[in-house]
Amino acid sequence: MSIEKAKEDFKYLINRGYKKDVALNFVANHYKLSKEDRLKIIRTTHSDKEIKLTKRKLKKLKDFKGKTIYIDGFNVLISLEALIKGNKIVLCDDNIYRDFENVYGKYKINEYSDKAISLLLEILKHYNIKAVIYLDAQVSKSGILAKKIREKMKAFSIEGEVFCVKNCDYELKNKEVVATSDSVIIKSENVKYVVDLIAEAIEYLKKK
């Protein structure tokens, strides 16, 4: 069975108003999909309405030189680590790059953490961006990671702050300019612009 057929059916259902989890369960059961295939579908496939909305909000980092952006910390760092490791990163149908790491909530500081943080800060410094980074407080050792990022921000002379918060999604849904690949945040009415930092990293690394 081609996963493409399952994606077509999933898209058909969400375009007709079915909730994503309901549509995914139906398609996954019908095609007997693995956990990996379920993850691929939910991350890469969006309704036509979502695609249109995301593409309208999507901006380049250079559009915000000297301004502040609000960053979905774990979301971005996990994807940057995947990129550095050479793991799969896919350009999805809404023009946002996403990983298939599936470690959110179980994230642990590792040998790639410093590299991912440094890459993020290099890119922000390149465009003179001020950054407010949110980390979910319930994730183990998020406080230690926040301290590590603050120290590196100081070393890179980047203005901003890192906050460990109860509900990262809630904070970001109420900001105007966000950096995330999370569709739930992207579709918030309060979010005016979205920056894909993984796309920025891919472009930045090509120039190095």
Swiss-Prot record:
Any matching Pfam family:
DUF434
* InterPro entries registered for this protein in UniProt: DUF434 (IPR007368), DUF5616 (IPR041652)
Specify the superkingdom. Answer: Archaea
What's the protein here called? Uncharacterized protein MJ0935
Species for this entry:
Methanocaldococcus jannaschii (strain ATCC 43067 / DSM 2661 / JAL-1 / JCM 10045 / NBRC 100440)
